[in-house]
């Protein structure tokens, strides 16, 4: 049995074991596929760049590849065929993910699949760039060993300092990330909390915050759709 995680066993329970992992945990918003492990590599130059099929070659075999804003079904299929262990993305289009999973089911039915493969989404669904703060941290740990749990939306990077964190209920003045359209995946600063309740496009009355996004746009966003980004603590 392969556990795909490295660490010290703390306890054994019916149906599983608890392991203390010497590294940093990055939580995504979702994912798919099996648990995998491999060396972390970055295949894009910019967190908003799309991961193209041409960026996947034999050098990526057995590795966990960090992409950018999305990957097509063609790119995911090529990565799977080349023996890539896993893919980390800001987001992915629902249709692309469904098409990829349909291809995998057909290949599995005819016995054409071997090994495991996982996909982790860090920011959301659709074309969503990785938060630059997170991307810089991942890039700084290229070459480290990592374990990816696609279905659980988790990435462990071994022997790494604490990753940039997130917190709900952001406060005025904090850097935030939006998690719903039309601003999904975009970063900015919460400059004010609006008084009273305000209606969303769907008609629901919610508390809103005023966010100045990094492109200079000022927009109201439901506070429930925002997370504060926490800086990496000094070593």
Predicted regions and their residues:
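Short, charged, surface-exposed secondary-structure boundary motifs
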Residues: 96-104, 129-132
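Beta-strand/loop-dominated core regions that host nucleotide or nucleotide-derived cofactor-binding catalytic loops
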Residues: 1-57, 62-64, 69-70, 91-95, ...
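Conserved anion-binding
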Residues: 105-130
